[in-house]
Curated annotation (Swiss-Prot):
It is an enzyme of class 3 (hydrolase). This is P3N-PIPO polyprotein. Coiled coil: none annotated. A motif (Involved in virions binding and aphid transmission) lies at residues 583-585. Pfam families: Peptidase_C6 (PF00851), Peptidase_S30 (PF01577), Potyvirid-P3 (PF13608). The record marks F274, S275, G731, G732 as: Cleavage. The lineage of its organism: Viruses, Riboviria, Orthornavirae, Pisuviricota, Stelpaviricetes. Keywords: Host cell junction, Host-virus interaction, Hydrolase, Inhibition of host innate immune response by virus, Protease, Serine protease, Suppressor of RNA silencing, Transport, Viral immunoevasion, Viral movement protein.
Amino acid sequence: MAATMIFGSFTHDLLGKAMSTIHSAVTAEKDIFSSIKERLERKRHGKICRMKNGSIYIKAASSTKVEKINAAAKKLADDKAAFLKAQPTIVDKIIVNEKIQVVEAEEVHKREDVQTVFFKKTKKRAPKLRATCSSSGLDNLYNAVANIAKASSLRVEVIHKKRVCGEFKQTRFGRALFIDVAHAKGHRRRIDCRMHRREQRTMHMFMRKTTKTEVRSKHLRKGDSGIVLLTQKIKGHLSGVRDEFFIVRGTCDDSLLEARARFSQSITLRATHFSTGDIFWKGFNASFQEQKAIGLDHTCTSDLPVEACGHVAALMCQSLFPCGKITCKRCIANLSNLDFDTFSELQGDRAMRILDVMRARFPSFTHTIRFLHDLFTQRRVTNPNTAAFREILRLIGDRNEAPFAHVNRLNEILLLGSKANPDSLAKASDSLLELARYLNNRTENIRNGSLKHFRNKISSKAHSNLALSCDNQLDQNGNFLWGLAGIAAKRFLNNYFETIDPEQGYDKYVIRKNPNGERKLAIGNFIISTNLEKLRDQLEGESIARVGITEECVSRKDGNYRYPCCCVTLEDGSPMYSELKMPTKNHLVIGNSGDPKYLDLPGEISNLMYIAKEGYCYINIFLAMLVNVDEANAKDFTKRVRDESVQKLGKWPSLIDVATECALLSTYYPAAASAELPRLLVDHAQKTIHVVDSYGSLNTGYHILKANTVSQLEKFASNTLESPMAQYKVGGLVYSENNDASAVKALTQAIFRPDVLSELIEKEPYLMVFALVSPGILMAMSNSGALEFGISKWISSDHSLVRMASILKTLASKVSVADTLALQKHIMRQNANFLCGELINGFQKKKSYTHATRFLLMISEENEMDDPVLNAGYRVLEASSHEIMEKNLSRTVRDILVRLKLVWKIQVNLVYAKALWKIQSRIVPKRADRLARTLQQLVAVSLPEYAQALEKQGESVSRKIFGKHFKCKTQDNMCSF
């Protein structure tokens, strides 16, 4: 037997028998080389790795990976060999499903240097991938969609040349696909379901997901039309089988019909279809016969078309229960979850539309038309009188006390109309009962009209003012410390009080006059007698004619007494009369119906004695409110009272106006609502409320108002309060009618004084509105640059003032092109409304704000009164007054120009020229009236007059006027800069 010797790649055959020892050695050598070869093979398919210390090594591949690589190489070689051995074929068509991407190969440069441990591996850019979809990928997509549709019972539509629709449903056979067939829609056709090849191929992907349960043909019934079953799983005789799937149409002669197959006309007519319509009519007929009316007085006949009856039944169903399908559980759930109002509204809207259809198409069904009309028109009864509802809500909507609460409830229920439920109707009856009781009691009270049971006693408990009990506001003697409020109180004392000189005596201050009479103060009692008898006589005072409790002493609201707004009585019902109020010095006395509290006036005011001027008595109420106002708000409070409250109240205001103003102030400063009032005495004979200050009252016998705090006094601020005292006079500020004239005069003077004009624009900008008094003043302000300066001054702080200046500048341009004075005045008056709307912006601390708004409102009201007269073709007698006003203003301007020194004239011209340089154009009136000419003369003063004056007064005047920034040059006999 021949043996072979192997050493590496060297092989040699040996003759003869080999010994067993030599054979075992050769086998061992063979095993050694095979393991080395296998290890090298794994190294060859391995990858290069680097260790943490930078060393590079080859990581061998696994045996499994090597086997896969060898198998792939063997398969590639076999395929190539098979391709080469195959017979030649003719290729007539090549179809490329995927787009071929051509990538240019880059030239590869081989590294010639030796790789070291510091070699940096470069990253290779991955080629950009493009989204492509092959036929297999598209099949996978269809398969995934089919799985989702089956799991969620979704509807599927396949559209190519025609639309094929299907839906997965849960059946007794499992979850199956149902294809839409024609006979389910009421059409009997020879082909029940048309499906082209492309549509059928796609639909097969979804048919594969249908149930695979074995089904006997006799188990199929109504409602199974369109179900897709596997042909192999159907037991029974089948007719028209197309492929592996069977779409059920119906039966004919015990044969199951395929929906995609074409059948003869006779089979189509004789076939029993498995649609749900037959089931519906079976249930409909059964229930209709069971519930058929009994005791009819006639024999029923078939008079109306059956198809029309079906239409009407469907319309009735849609009007009562609007839905997409009567078998849809989701529609049923949606209708069940609607509230009554929404469901009724939905029914009503559908019923009204369906009624129109029934009247047009099915007029013979009069009973259904009448039923729907009566049912839904009665359910949709509404109250058309919404204007009355809004008016009631406006009058008493905010009142929650009886009987207004009952009226509001009735008003709301009546608005509901047919939506009112039985509970609401029961509440309406209860409210009506309460109204009847109230009216009955009110009638009885009015009929009696007696005050013998009226009692309004003073509370035995003293009012606790928290502002006077805070340790931080009391000194070591327990006296109230005003703090910063004391400084703000000066605004009251400086404007509305006058000082008393004790050296001149107190006689002239004893009598305080009011519009209806007078009252004696106790200020003369500062000088008292040491004789006890005479002192007791002084303490008696001087009594006025005393009156008892009358209707003027009480205040009612809703038929009930408002006790804080009534006069104080004793236990027997008689009025409590005021006694002598002794005077004190430098005190504020608060506490009306209880024990008085004496507060020292602020130490910042000095030790002078102050007394309110005639008509200013109610300022003591605001001074008492200042005690409870926080120190941080004291300054704003006093400014608001001075600039707004006192301006509106006027002289001797009524009590209702004072109470309303207190309510307004309490809104801005809530702490002031709990402030205690000064002593308030009621004089019914003179219809006056006396606000008693620290100088007391010599007269006695007045009634006492029970209101002790500002919040109680605010109850008078109501139009529904039945109180004669609400119209009593209190006291106020004498308004000066010369305020407008003073404002115009100040504005005119400021035009010729640039420094004054700048200060006026900064501190009282609203005075610029008074330029509407005259067209000449308006144009002069525009030429002087005042409006431009104002716009630049306020552009970042107050946009309303910027709009005001812009409107005035525009008006100046419009007025300059007017031909007559009347037309100029008309232009300014017509724009007053717009300017007023831009100007009014809540409360402003500027003193000129109130005057400016009042001036604009006056012009607006005059326009409102004159417009109907002018539109009717008449003229108002204003032209002559305008001419006179212009003459007076012209005379005033000339007087101002005469008084101006030459230095000021030159400086004014400099300012004008500087302003004109900025605004580039000067407004020149087309009609040069008297005032306009006077104002324009100042602008056009020639340089020779200045040069002559400079020669007389010296060069120092030139430096004073022009400074070091301006130089005077002669050019065309005018001054240029």
